[in-house]
Amino acid sequence: MKVAVAGAGAVGRSVTRELVENGHDITLIERNPDHLDAAAIPEAHWRLGDACELSLLESIHLEEFDVVVAATGDDKVNVVLSLLAKTEFAVPRVVARVNDPRNEWLFNDAWGVDVAVSTPRMLASLIEEAVTIGDLVRLMEFRTGQANLVEITLPDNTPWGGKPVRKLQLPRDAALVTILRGPRVIVPEADEPLEGGDELLFVAVTEAEEELSRLLLPSM
């Protein structure tokens, strides 16, 4: 997967490092020469320049990228880059970092943002989710204990379509906490039917993740 990351600060580098380790092709854009350190992540393609300048985005052929990540420390830059990526280059997935919660209302599809997040680990997970429908994605590791917040997006042709939540025989130490369906946030009652495209959020121990995948994604 080709990913362009804007911002080589702590967040941008953290995201880039994690995605590189997972085998993705990353271009890291930074406008401050003092932050440009190709030796820090030699596997990434480093570019010096302003991510809000069309000429720079054209020079890296942004239209060929699968995902753009606006990870700078400036919300204005992140919003402008998101809009350019979506409207000028038709990038399929745009993920943006929100620095100031008061600006969160700006980070929506009207400004080209598909997903707005605020923590590096969740940022990296949601970037990868762009091409991992039908995979288990670990969104967050809790500080205490061994539990994680994990997400599974059911494929459109899921065999679980139309079946109620109570039919799920979940592994021990795994709990379904939320179903995201379009704009809705659904509390998973026993009789709630599942649908293709549902995003299921679980709290589960690491050992239960593989069993969850086998249960919900048997053909994957």
Curated annotation (Swiss-Prot):
The keyword rRNA-binding does not apply. Residues 137-218 form the RCK C-terminal domain. InterPro entries: K_uptake_TrkA (IPR006036), NAD(P)-bd_dom_sf (IPR036291), RCK_C (IPR006037), RCK_C_sf (IPR036721), RCK_N (IPR003148), Trk_Ktr_HKT_K-transport (IPR050721). Residues 1-117 form the RCK N-terminal domain. One of its GO terms (biological process) is potassium ion transport. Keywords: Ion transport, NAD, Potassium, Potassium transport, Transport. One of its GO terms (molecular function) is potassium ion transmembrane transporter activity. GO terms for cellular component: plasma membrane. NAD(+) binds at G7, A8, G9, A10, V11, E30, D50, T72, G73, R97. The RCK N-terminal domain binds NAD and possibly other effectors. This is expected to cause a conformation change that regulates potassium transport. Part of a potassium transport system. PANTHER family: POTASSIUM CHANNEL PROTEIN 2-RELATED-RELATED (PTHR43833), TRK SYSTEM POTASSIUM UPTAKE PROTEIN TRKA (PTHR43833:SF5). This is Trk system potassium uptake protein TrkA. It comes from Mycobacterium tuberculosis (strain ATCC 25618 / H37Rv). The gene is trkA.
